[in-house]
A protein has these predicted regions:
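Conserved beta-strand in the GNAT
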Residues: 49, 56-64, 69-76
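Conserved acetyl-CoA-binding loop-helix of GNAT-fold acetyltransferases
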Residues: 77, 82-94
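Short acidic/glycine-enriched loop/turn segments that link adjacent beta-strands
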Residues: 42-44, 68, 131-135
Length: 177
């Protein structure tokens, strides 16, 4: 399996076709929601997808910035309940944090998927609303400033630097907790 992250202008025609086909199959056909699936946001997005060895897309989302706000949208996992949705969302969040230095991400989630996003750290920020006949909620993800797993976080760099300065590590135990 491969994870691919590309801006719109770097996608091949085959990649773009595969992305649009999956999105139409899920959002228009499966959800019976006849609306314009292809939009101008595609041209300003990073397209993030997981594909198998046969180039079949298993999960997809797009990450984009409007004004000063980053958004993730068009999240798809197909087939469902295999962990692909979690994997693609974690990849998108990590890419946003480490490469684009994003602290906050907004999504408009279908309400049936709200718990899925909450497990990833998103919190609900709106009352339910209708979008194209489907109930959604707005949600927000805020990067945890003291994320111990983020070695690029400035606080973690300070700890590493302090640890290198001292021969006796007992002197810095208070900094590690």
């Amino acid at each position: 399996m491969d994870t691919i992250i590309k801006p719109f202008d770097k996608l091949t025609t085959q990649e773009l076709f595969n992305i649009y086909k999956l999105r139409v199959d899920v959002f228009v056909v499966e959800q019976q929601c006849p609306y314009h699936e292809v939009d101008d946001i595609d041209t300003i997005s990073h397209h993030i997808y997981l594909q198998n060895d046969n180039s079949k897309i298993l999960a997809y989302c797009r990450l984009y910035k409007i004004e000063d706000t980053f958004h993730i949208g068009r999240v798809i996992a197909s087939p469902k309940r295999k962990g692909y949705g979690t994997q693609i969302m974690k990849t998108a969040i990590e890419f946003a944090e480490t490469t684009l230095h994003v602290d906050t991400i907004i999504i408009e989630a279908q309400t049936y998927a709200q718990e899925f996003y909450e497990k990833l750290g998103f919190i609900q920020t709106s009352e339910p609303f209708d979008e194209d006949g489907i109930e959604h909620v707005r949600m927000k993800y805020v990067r945890k400033k003291n994320n111990k797993n983020n070695t690029n976080h400035p606080e973690n760099k300070k700890i590493i630097i302090k640890a290198k300065k001292y021969r006796n590590l007992n002197k810095i135990n208070c900094c590690l907790y």
